[in-house]
Amino acid sequence: MRSILPTRVLLLLLLATSINAWSADGRILNFEGDVRVNGQPVTADTALKKEDTITTAPGASAKIILSDNSVLDLEGGSEILISDYSFNPSAPETNTSKVDILAGTLRYVSGRIAKDDPDNISFTAGNSTIGVRGSFISISVDPKAEKAEK
């Protein structure tokens, strides 16, 4: 009886971890330096969801993979908001990916959503909206310059 209880507890913990991973829209694939999600420090495999804000301190970097296999690379001093994200491979007409680039530099390699319908992908940088018509983009935003223009 004693050996069954620890096994059951371990199975429950594994199941809870797996369910959390399945419900995530993406995750931190790897990172270096001070990287935060909603103000909290990340760890390897930190789960990401719609409406999360990801911030990299100067000199830091992060690689994010979303559930459609698109990849976002953030350089140091960057901040993005996953403003909308939905991926269902069996209903591609409902898929959407919208990212607001608040500061810094983002590199993007497209995944399944862009392949199925590029109109379902957009990036907002300041007053600009960027659509994807290829498989790779790089965007830099300087929020100080944007404020000076207003």
Model-derived regions: residue spans:
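Bacterial N-terminal signal peptides that target proteins for export
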Residues: 1-10
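N-terminal signal peptide c-region/cleavage motif recognized by signal peptidases
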Residues: 16-18, 23
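Sec-dependent N-terminal signal peptides of Gram-positive bacterial secreted proteins and lipoproteins
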Residues: 11-15
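Flexible, surface-exposed loop/linker segments and immediately adjacent secondary-structure boundaries
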Residues: 24-53, 57-150
